[in-house]
A protein has these predicted regions:
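Active-site hotspot residues in diverse enzymes, especially metal/ion-binding acidic/histidine motifs
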Residues: 1-217
Length: 217
């Protein structure tokens, strides 16, 4: 499948699925999936039309995952900005991961990272890469940032010589259980940001000292 993909368009072509975008007024509500109890009725996905096209595309993937894989767990799923105590955190995490993998597959993202790896040695370099990938896959910057963080172990393997087919995809819990600890590109972005901020402050301090010395002389 060519990328970027329009999940809303795909959902609109699925028989037995009704998709609508409406202005949802509840705070933080991004979408709703209503699963039919009877095969004669359509499943329904409602998206918040107050959100932009990229956000709705991701939300649609999230709700579609509920429709496809979580029928056993209930009839209605609300996609909220922050998961509430009454929601199943694991199912919401699964739906987010499913939408992210559908829109930004790791087998397409990892080669892009390796190709640009030499430019990812500064805060701005990583920021530029995130922006470039968000345009390539038609997602928000935050989706790419989360992918870079979640796929840190997979990225480590690939840039160090593993083939795409040999890359092991492990959850954070499995990595911790196996004693695997990797630094993500998002961790490095924060490191570079602080380093560059400190460097800027140092130069500013020296500049101020020079101005004071000139004034005294």
């Amino acid at each position: 499948k060519s990328y970027p993909i329009n999940i809303k368009k795909i959902c609109g072509e699925i028989e037995g699925l009704t998709l609508e975008s409406i202005p949802l007024k509840s705070k933080g509500l991004r979408g709703i999936a209503v699963l039919s109890k009877d095969k004669s009725d359509d499943d329904i996905i409602l998206l918040n039309s107050n959100r932009d096209a990229c956000e709705q595309n991701f939300d649609c993937g999230h709700e579609l995952y509920h429709v496809a894989f979580h029928r056993y767990a209930g009839n209605t799923f609300n996609c909220l900005e922050n998961v509430k105590p009454c929601q199943n955190k694991f199912l919401e995490w699964q739906a987010n991961e499913g939408s992210a993998e559908l829109l930004v597959p790791y087998k397409l993202l990892l080669p892009e990272i390796k190709k640009s790896y030499c430019t990812l040695k500064s805060y701005q370099g990583i920021q530029n890469f995130i922006y470039k990938m968000s345009k390539k896959f038609n997602v928000t910057d935050s989706v790419i940032s989360i992918r870079l963080d979640d796929l840190k172990y997979e990225i480590f393997q690939y840039v160090n010589g593993a083939s795409l087919n040999d890359v092991k995809v492990l959850s954070d819990k499995r990595q911790k259980d196996d004693g695997i600890y990797c630094i993500s590109l998002i961790d490095m972005r924060e490191f570079y940001r602080k380093k560059e901020e400190k460097k800027h402050k140092f130069h500013y301090y020296n500049s101020c000292k020079a101005d004071i010395n000139i004034y005294r002389s």
